Swiss-Prot record:
It comes from Methanococcus vannielii (strain ATCC 35089 / DSM 1224 / JCM 13029 / OCM 148 / SB). GO terms for cellular component: small ribosomal subunit. It holds the Pfam family S4. One of the primary rRNA binding proteins, it binds directly to 16S rRNA where it nucleates assembly of the body of the 30S subunit. With S5 and S12 plays an important role in translational accuracy. This is Small ribosomal subunit protein uS4.
Length: 178
């Protein structure tokens, strides 16, 4: 057991730090999704790697307990809309990519819904406390939004961004209508 005051890392770093094509790919993904540093990307990659590892373990497990664990894994991935197939198999989990998880981040969904003009602005609105999910203020851009919370993303009611005549809001709304 570890020391409760020193939590373990939630991500794994790349094996080799200076591979040019990996760095270029990470840069493109970071720019597309508005990630601030590579650690955010590595956290999501580690989460995806854990889902895949669990699926590989369940492929070889033919017991009833293995079947129950597979159903639980399917339910978790469906709850966050990471896995969208109606009749999922473990092979579908193995074919997931990093973008399927990054699309479910609050920062990405705020940008996609038109509440912000850019992914970077979406991040700023979230960190500054202008965005609420189900009426609760969420200040973490990496918050994974479940399917049930998908339509409940909006501005915090007492935020200046909630006013219709706010200059940043009118640009976002007018661009969304066009």
């Amino acid at each position: 057991m570890g020391d409760p005051r020193r939590l373990g890392k939630k991500y794994d770093t790349p094996n080799h730090p200076w591979i040019g094509e990996r760095i270029q790919k990470e840069r493109e993904i970071s720019h597309k999704y508005g990630l601030v540093n590579k650690k955010e990307l590595w956290k999501m990659e580690t989460q995806l790697r854990n889902y895949r590892r669990q699926a590989r373990k369940l492929i070889s497990d033919t017991t009833t307990q293995g079947g129950k664990e597979a159903v639980q894994l399917f339910n978790v991935l469906k709850r966050y809309a990471i896995l969208v197939e109606q009749e999922p198999t473990l092979d579908h989990i193995l074919s997931l990519n990093i973008e399927s998880i990054l699309e479910r981040r609050l920062q990405t969904l705020v940008y996609r819904k038109g509440l912000a003009k850019t992914a970077k602005q979406a991040r700023q609105l979230i960190v500054h406390g202008h965005i609420a999910v189900n009426g609760r203020r969420v200040t973490s851009p990496s918050y994974l939004v479940s399917v049930s919370e998908n339509n409940a993303i909006g501005y915090v009611p007492n935020s200046p961004m909630a006013l219709e005549n706010h200059p940043e809001r009118t640009t976002a709304v007018s661009e969304e209508n066009q």
